[in-house]
């Protein structure tokens, strides 16, 4: 049996703002939109990466403070961040800075090889870009 990731699900505070952010900053495209159980659900795709955005409108709870800091959040059980692999980290950073993305750290090297850097989306969700 073959296993492969299908999507990463993210709860967002505003569907339209989040769609625009992921389209403008990272190049994702909307592939499905629907409502179910009182929430808006949107699927986005960029090459082989799919995101599923959930929004409960005014009933959406804010991101807890401990989830806003990369180091603090690593101490808590659960999913940590979205990581997208790129061919050229320096080029991607330059493009994202040109789109007013603010990075929360300097480039670092992974213990298993490669380089990475983190930033946050418009909801404060941590995103890593990584080059092997």
Predicted regions and their residues:
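Short glycine-/small-residue motifs
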Residues: 129
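Tryptophan-centered motif/residue detector
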Residues: 21, 87-89, 112
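Conserved active-site tyrosine of GNAT-family acetyltransferases
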Residues: 18-23, 96, 124
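Helix N-cap motif at beta-to-alpha junctions
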Residues: 14-16, 87-90
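Conserved beta-strand-loop-alpha-helix junction that forms the acyl-donor binding cleft
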Residues: 12-15, 36
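Vicinal oxygen chelate
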Residues: 1-4, 29-83, 93-120, 132
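Short hydrophobic/aromatic beta-strand micro-patches
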Residues: 9-11, 83-85
